[in-house]
Amino acid sequence: MDLAPGRRARLLVALALVVLVALAARSGAEVITLTEETFSDKIKEKDTVWFVKFCVPWCKHCKNLGTLWEDLGKVMEGADEIEIGQVDCGVSKPVCSKVDIHSYPTFKVFYEGEEVAKYKGPRNVESLKNFVSDEAEKAGEAKLQDS
């Protein structure tokens, strides 16, 4: 396909805009995949609560979650200092061993490098949101008391 230079430039600009709009729609709403290389540094981030799902692709209980974790990521998009993460224990086995994962799915909250809670409640967005928000509030209060 041979395009005139002006038409080619317009096509490239249009394509770039489509990509930017798609990326903007996803920014802040995505669940962050944590790996052996990134897990420790991320969960140690100052003043940041990490709510992490540990799963493996072959687990029927993980599959039954459907889009729950992604939906939580979207709902928590505007939440200050709360990040939603996930670890594939099939790929990042050392991470899952380090934090004592023995069943799937497992949901844990980390604050400044330490595990502060494990979620065992209902599997719906509202319950997950309330849980991690409460844990973030507790972490903030504990930090103020330590100061």
Swiss-Prot record:
Q: Which InterPro entries match?
A: PDI, Thioredoxin-like_sf, Thioredoxin_domain
User: What pairs make up the disulfide bonds?
Assistant: C59-C62
Q: Which residues form the signal peptide?
A: 1-29
Q: Where is this site: Lowers pKa of C-terminal Cys of active site?
A: R123
In the UniProt entry, which residues are flagged as the active site?
C59, C62
Boundaries of every Thioredoxin domain copy: 30-137
Pfam families for the chain: Thioredoxin
- A Gene Ontology biological process term: protein folding
The UniProt keyword set, sorted, is: Disulfide bond, Redox-active center, Signal
Going by the entry's taxonomy, the superkingdom of the source organism is recorded as Eukaryota
Q: Enumerate the GO terms in the molecular function aspect.
A: protein disulfide isomerase activity
**Gene Ontology cellular-component annotations:** endoplasmic reticulum
Q: So what family is this one in?
A: Belongs to the protein disulfide isomerase family.
According to its UniProt entry, the function of this protein is described as: Acts as a protein-folding catalyst that interacts with nascent polypeptides to catalyze the formation, isomerization, and reduction or oxidation of disulfide bonds. May play a role in storage protein biogenesis.
Name of the protein in its database record:
Protein disulfide isomerase-like 5-1
Q: Which organism is it from?
A: Oryza sativa subsp. japonica (Rice)
